[in-house]
Amino acid sequence: MKWEGIVFTFLLIYSSSFGCIFFLTPLIPFVYFQPRLGRWLMDQMIWLWQLYAVFLYEKICGVKAVISGDAVYDDECELIIMNHRTRFDWLFVFSYQIRCGSLRHFKISLKEILKNVPGPGWAMQCAGYLFLHRNWEHDKSTISKCFMYFKKLNYKPQILLFPEGTDLTAWTKAKSDKFAKANGVEPYEYVLHPRTRGFKYFVEQMRDVNLFDSIIDVTVGYPINIPQNESDILKGNFPKEVHFFIKRHKALDIPSSEENVDMWCQKVWKEKEERLKKFYQDKKFHVKDNKIKLKDESEIQSLFKFANIFWSIFQISTFILLIYAPIIRWFALLSIGIFVFISKFGGIQVLLDSELESAKHYM
């Protein structure tokens, strides 16, 4: 077990938990009474924490992001689809998003169980992430409400979706191979067969509310070290590099019929399989015409420094105040109680209906 893994895990959990308690709890009323302002304030605080998370794993743990492929735009409404190699793809993709997309407007589709994780899960609720039950009727309603919410607030989300539904392990690969055999299709080695029903519905809903500029197809690869789960991170088994290959597809180029969207997704995943096969042979993506445009790295490094200073001061101050200031302890307990109560009744997401009604006044 390396010290980097312990320090990274502690600081990530400490900052997200107490940041949620002291910064996000006071913003919850704005979600109801001032939806646009509430969303903006929440996004600023989540963005500041995401910067800190990237600083920790890039600067403390030595992870390097390598990005290539098509140019993308940070002011577009995007559906980002990516292969799910490890349980930490969603975290490492921050490195791509901060350099190419909009980290403030970045949302993730995650498993429902994650929203109830004390601290980090509560922060994810406030971030506006989509939590899906794998109950189709329930999930359809959740997805529809989320896009109506973004539409009412004139908000341009960039949403990460993992069509495979889970990360690549020996067990999930066996299930994917079984599916392939049953359906007479080729088994994959480097990706899982995508579950296209959710993907098709995302595309449909984004079109319906006119929040659909492009699909960003991200292929992620780990040439050295693949941290599969939380224990790998705790042990300090971080990837030396995370490679992202980007293909941008204009919304107008995506088929309109549900059947053709299904076939399009299957085709994209077959291309991913072939691309990753070559990647793991050569330890890099081969790019004929690299059009990617990265943001100024010096500005990003300045943001990292700011985030590090901000969260370091906050964490030290919080530690001292929790010891010596009873009112701070009572506020922390009150905040925890609020999040436990809200989570028990569906989480921040249940406020979406109220937000939709309130947001009508801003249209």
For the regions a language model picked out, list residue spans one by one.
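Tryptophan-centered motif/residue detector
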Residues: W49, W90, I108, W136, ...
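Soluble catalytic domains of membrane acyltransferases
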Residues: L56-S231
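Membrane-anchoring hydrophobic helices of lipid-metabolizing enzymes
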Residues: M1-E78, T86, L91-F92
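Generic detection of long, well-ordered alpha-helical segments
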Residues: E4, R39-W47, K140, L192, ...
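Membrane-proximal, acidic/low-complexity disordered segments on the non-cytosolic side
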Residues: W40-Q44, L48-W49, A53, F331-M363
